[in-house]
Regions:
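Membrane-interfacial amphipathic/re-entrant helices at transmembrane-helix boundaries
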Residues: 1-27, 40, 54, 62-68
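Alpha-helical transmembrane segments within multi-pass membrane transporters and channels
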Residues: 63-108
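Short helix-capping/hinge motifs at transmembrane helix termini and TM-loop junctions
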Residues: 35, 63, 91, 113-117
Length: 137
């Protein structure tokens, strides 16, 4: 009986890790490509937070999750452009610039997102079931 509990707990932890770790996995893959190009981007977390708040805000106000996604891509691109400007043009250290962007994104997303906490829901993207993977419990 006790073994079944631990197996169930392990399965639940792995399932939760896969579910909640997908966004971090995407950021990790992006950072791997950036590292291969010789860029150390420590500010990915701030960029992701700003993109998430922007996507939610735009999707809620426009009623379209696709426009929210495009806005998040634009904000992420602007923050990446700011990182490139600081490191290439101003010759700032990549770690310092990345940490500044991480702190900026974290703080600014908290300030912008505070009024959105009371908002119930925003439009969602449609589901795209993958034939083999969608049948896995």
């Amino acid at each position: 009986m006790e073994l079944n509990f631990w197996i169930g707990l392990l399965i639940g932890l792995v399932a939760a890790g896969i579910t909640y770790g997908t966004g971090i996995l995407f950021a990790t893959i992006g950072e791997i490509f950036a590292e291969r190009a010789g860029v150390l981007n420590v500010g990915l977390e701030g960029m992701m937070l700003m993109g998430a708040v922007t996507a939610y805000l735009v999707a809620y106000n426009t009623g379209s999750a696709w426009i929210g996604l495009l806005a998040a891509i634009g904000v992420g691109g602007l923050m990446a452009l700011l990182h490139a400007f600081m490191t290439v043009t101003l010759r700032a250290d990549q770690v310092v610039s990345g940490l500044a962007l991480a702190l900026l994104g974290s703080g600014l997303s908290a300030v912008i997102g505070a009024p959105l906490v009371e908002v119930r829901t925003a439009p969602r993207l449609p589901e795209f079931p993958i034939p083999v993977l969608s049948n896995i419990p």
